[in-house]
UniProtKB/Swiss-Prot annotation:
The active site is at H37 (proton donor). Homodimer. Belongs to the pantothenate synthetase family. The keyword Isomerase does not apply. The reaction proceeds by a bi uni uni bi ping pong mechanism. Beta-alanine binds at Q61. InterPro entries: Cyt_trans-like, Pantoate_ligase, Pantoate_ligase_C, Rossmann-like_a/b/a_fold. The gene is panC. It catalyses: (R)-pantoate + beta-alanine + ATP = (R)-pantothenate + AMP + diphosphate + H(+). This is Pantothenate synthetase. The lineage of its organism: Bacteria, Pseudomonadati, Pseudomonadota, Gammaproteobacteria, Enterobacterales. Catalyzes the condensation of pantoate with beta-alanine in an ATP-dependent reaction via a pantoyl-adenylate intermediate. Disulfide bonds: none annotated. ATP binds at residues 30-37, 149-152, 186-189.
Amino acid sequence: MLIIETLPLLRQQIRRLRMEGKRVALVPTMGNLHDGHMKLVDEAKARADVVVVSIFVNPMQFDRPEDLARYPRTLQEDCEKLNKRKVDLVFAPSVKEIYPNGTETHTYVDVPGLSTMLEGASRPGHFRGVSTIVSKLFNLVQPDIACFGEKDFQQLALIRKMVADMGFDIEIVGVPIMRAKDGLALSSRNGYLTAEQRKIAPGLYKVLSSIADKLQAGERDLDEIIAIAGQELNEKGFRSDDIQIRDADTLLEVSENSKRAVILVAAWLGDARLIDNKLVELA
């Protein structure tokens, strides 16, 4: 497994792979890897000849400096996990390598609408940072496919739109959420939970499932469903942050023409902001 930290060396390897006619898959990550990331790697390996995993804690997508400062940097452990998975290439650049002149004056990619709604409304600049770094990685790695987790549902929708709008010839693969046995969605942020909070955390998925059951039973008073769910989260020990029920295909308000809904939930548990989602077919 090659570990590359500079743009010239990455370009050199990508040119070689292209000359050899290899099909390349990219798995963009911020490190602190868990089994959910490994599922992305496995999906990439099944679809391509060569798998490139990027590990880069992107300062441009953090709306709070304290979150950036405390995000775990576990490069050695991450590389050991990826080596066991027989990943071909790890791209682990420094911030200076990606943003040599800083982030303030760096060219950015913005996806209007999707960047500022839902999660984007409460995290200004976050999705602009995501679309900028992902587009830069696409230009550098030139992958045939790229794998992203469905846990970050809005992010996946944003990347699909960016790829379509910008004409990237890349297949975007959404990989289903991986959960612990008790239902908690795997996330790097779960590491912020204390032992006691970890026992409470599966309650998020239980509330999510309760909303889904109501929708599948034909309930359509969305305001009431959301209000009850928020109350349930608070009673379980969370601080409900945002609960949305949206059209899964547009992320707009659910209408009588909507065929699928996505339930998007965000809640604080201690210092961890947990997010989860669930798709529901509407009768």
